[in-house]
Regions:
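Short glycine/proline- and aromatic-enriched beta-strand/turn motifs that initiate or cap beta-hairpins
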Residues: 9-72
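Membrane-embedded beta-strand positions of outer-membrane beta-barrel proteins
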Residues: 29-31, 55, 65-67, 88, ...
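Detector for outer-membrane/organellar transmembrane beta-barrel domains
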Residues: 131-211, 222, 226
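Short loop/turn motifs that connect adjacent beta-strands in outer-membrane beta-barrel proteins
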Residues: 16-25, 93-100, 134, 162-175, ...
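Short sequence motifs at beta-strands and strand-loop junctions characteristic
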Residues: 45-47, 78-80, 118-120, 147-149, ...
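Transmembrane beta-strands of outer-membrane beta-barrel pores
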Residues: 33-39, 59-61, 69-73, 104-110, ...
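Bacterial Sec-dependent N-terminal signal peptides
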Residues: 1-14, 272-279
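Outer-membrane beta-barrel "beta-signal"
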Residues: 157, 262-279
Length: 279
């Protein structure tokens, strides 16, 4: 999750349970700033931040494509290009109670990119949301492809509040308190030593070192966020404070390069963007 961009909320709504509105072609462009880069709460040791220009096009057929340009900076490096991610997918017809999508992503990082998730080269995902007046429930699953394949699942609860502004045409403020949990497979090498007892005659015992491949499925993080989005006509701005709590960090003895770093952390995502609709 290189960038956590926030789209403009939908101001119009309907009361029926059919398709919410006739689909339109939508072009979206935004710039996102993330104060502390993380991937499921995992961070690099340099406390990097990032800037992510994003462009996307949603076809009225449901097909869509998104390109994200990744720039990172930290105490040892000024803002520099680190890679590009490309996502293509299909959004299911949206109704009063359902929305969802399937997507495939390709990540193209530079050789010098120091990003926690840079080992992931491709990803396939499916997400579905059940919407009601109390809480929206989202579930998702994904396959992450690197030197090996990992499975991830996510669950999210949120409730969207939209306040239309009087005196300003086509404007609103949206607040969307959100709680999320992410789980997935973890594959790593574990080495441990076992000492055997001495034999008769007083000879010392021996120490045997054993290495094994470990494949586990664990909770990876909990995250709480409160996106606040301001929309005026075709333009929008968002500020998303978030608190992430990583779980089950991998620690490999004497191999820090194979270990994960992370702790409970607060960070902010800021977004400005433009959304254009046309038939």
């Amino acid at each position: 999750m290189a960038a956590r961009s926030q789209n403009a909320p939908t101001i119009d709504s309907t009361k029926n349970d059919s398709t919410v509105s006739t689909r339109k072609n939508v072009f979206n462009a935004s710039v996102n700033y993330v104060s502390r880069l993380n991937y499921l709460g995992r961070v690099d040791s340099l406390k990097s931040s990032g800037v992510f220009p994003v462009i996307s096009f949603d076809s009225k057929t449901g097909l869509y494509a998104t390109g994200t340009f990744i720039f990172t900076q930290n105490s040892l490096q000024p803002l520099a290009y680190a890679g590009t991610s490309i996502e293509a997918g299909y959004k299911f017809p949206e109704s009063k109670h359902f929305s969802g999508n399937i997507a495939y992503s390709k990540f193209l990082y530079t050789n010098t990119a120091d990003i926690v998730q840079s080992a992931v080269k491709e990803q396939a995902a499916v997400n579905a949301t059940w919407k009601n007046k109390y809480v929206n429930v989202t579930g998702g699953a994904e396959l992450r492809f690197s030197d090996q394949t990992d499975i991830g699942v996510t669950g999210t609860l949120d409730h969207l509040f939209i306040f239309k502004l009087t005196g300003i045409k086509k404007s609103a403020i949206a607040i969307d308190p959100t709680a999320a949990i992410n789980a997935g497979s973890q594959k790593f090498v574990q080495t441990y030593s076992k000492k055997t007892g001495g034999i008769l005659g007083g000879l010392p015992g021996t120490t045997q070192t054993t290495t094994q491949n470990v494949n586990q499925f664990n909770i990876l993080d909990y995250e709480f966020s409160v996106p606040v989005v301001f929309v005026i006509d075709k333009f929008y701005a968002a500020l998303t404070p978030a608190y992430v709590m990583p779980q089950n960090l991998i620690a490999v003895s004497n191999k820090p390069e194979l270990s994960e770093t992370g702790s409970n952390m607060f960070y902010i995502t800021a977004t400005v963007g433009m959304r254009l609709e046309f038939r």
